[in-house]
Amino acid sequence: MKQHFTCIGIVGRPRHDSALITHKTLYEWLIKNGYKVFIEHTVARELKLNNPNTATLIEIGEFCDLAVVIGGDGNLLCAARVLSFYNIKIIGINRGNLGFLADLNPDTGLKKLSEVLSGNYSLENRFLLDAQVCQKKIISRSSIAINEVVLHTKNLAHMIEFEVYIDNKFSFSQRADGLIVSTPTGSTGYSLSAGGPIIAASLDAIVLVPMFPHTLSARPLVIHSDSIICLKFSNIQTNLKISCDSQIILTIKKGECVFIRRSCYYLNLIHPKSYNYFKTLTSKLSWSKKFF
């Protein structure tokens, strides 16, 4: 088998025996096939391997050309938040529930992975979002998001008054529990649950979805991914926060605003050649079967 990848990182958070077996089987299979393998520290401790090459996520990003993430979409998102800063490709073996991103089936994972490792794969460059909390155009706090940036309050079901500017032009004002700003990758997640549209992964688009708006006319808004979004708040607003992929939370203080824009970094996600985005949607969302 011709090696299109030479150094492979194994990433995951095994929480049950079947996941541990998948990690160990993958590790032994890669070693047997002559690959240099780095395995994340926490995974190596769980597997109790004999003198493996261990590494942090950052080291895997620096030294490996492919990372195999074993787990659900949450595990892949967590790993990708670090690995997206490096020139490394990522593929996922699903050990979670949905598996929109981690799409390899554990039962056929090694067969499909063998095809990928021989160069028979497709590459998707999924763009990220930069979220910046600013005070007079000076960045106070920032983070990235692969799925979505969510404006919300510290307390549940508290209304927020805010204004949305797109490319320095006033777009709309809103009284709502919050706002979801989603990438195409995130459009099948939290955004979809809030009534947002599904955006094909290849589109250069961002969707803004109000959360429980205090009006009947509020609708999701789809804009070009090159647009810069600014959220402004009245001075009476308190306890405001933005959440990036439900993993990083940034506090918004009095007098601060939020800028959200397309990041210069990408999630380099790869799939077997047989991967079909719309077939995945049909399967995961239980859409109707073909009539003929």
Swiss-Prot record:
Its cofactor is a divalent metal cation. GO terms for molecular function: ATP binding; metal ion binding; NAD binding; NAD+ kinase activity. GO terms for biological process: NAD metabolic process; NADP biosynthetic process. Its main location: cytoplasm. It catalyses: NAD(+) + ATP = ADP + NADP(+) + H(+). The active site is at D73 (proton acceptor). Belongs to the NAD kinase family. This is NAD kinase.
